[in-house]
Amino acid sequence: MSEIQKHDHLLIETPPTVIGFSSVRSFGAEFRSRPRNRATHGELLESQWRAIWAKHDEDEATKPHIVALPAKDGIYVHFEGAPDCNLKIDSLEDKRQGIVLLNAMTHLSSDESGEHEVENAVVYVPNNKRNSFLKKIEDYVQSEPSEKGTFKNQKLMESIEKIRFAFWDSMWTGRPEDRPQDTPLWCEVWLRNDKRTVVDANVENVTRFFEICAKLNIAHKNQILFFPERNVCMIKANAEQLQQLMDN
């Protein structure tokens, strides 16, 4: 077998253009959703949303904070769609308010009728924007029908089956069988970067993350990859440590 020829790395000097996330749909495919009773479904989503924040406030008041560890000023929320339906993922994000889509994925679930595709999304919501989603629910339930007979935020609300806290495995994008358990494993961490170009990559963001890793006794490599809006580094952690990272 001939040896693989080696080439120099490609260096792209021109800053890239940032394009916002949009759901991938087949041409002409209809958005699949499940009809809902507005009052009942709105009440369910509101109760789940309020329960998430009540638990968050309780945990913040009782959990021991690690000295010198920077406090997280928001939570990660996991939105789950209905089986074999679409989740209106692009409407979950509002960057102007700091509400950021972090992960979108499709899982398979099984029941007595067979296997079903379930769309999921993880969104970061700042503490001071916790009422933003409640306002969307309120508009959905209380709005008057449009000329087409639809209601405000109807497509978004009807696409959501349930809302819960996002745990570390909600952020895992690799194979499920590769997830760390009790034994620490090397894995990539993609850190959000508020800057929009590689040149302006937020090194302080990574430095702060490494400080958190040190406080939690999590090993890491010093090499960093900078991309627009994301910084990538390697850490060696188990499931418990990954959850601690998300909690802090």
PLM segments and residue spans:
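Beta-strand-enriched, solvent-exposed domains that form extended recognition/catalytic surfaces
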Residues: 216-220
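Short acidic alpha-helix initiation/capping motifs at coil-to-helix transition points
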Residues: 203, 222-224
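Autoinhibitory N-terminal propeptides
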Residues: 1-212, 248
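Protease zymogen maturation seam
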Residues: 225-231, 236, 240-248
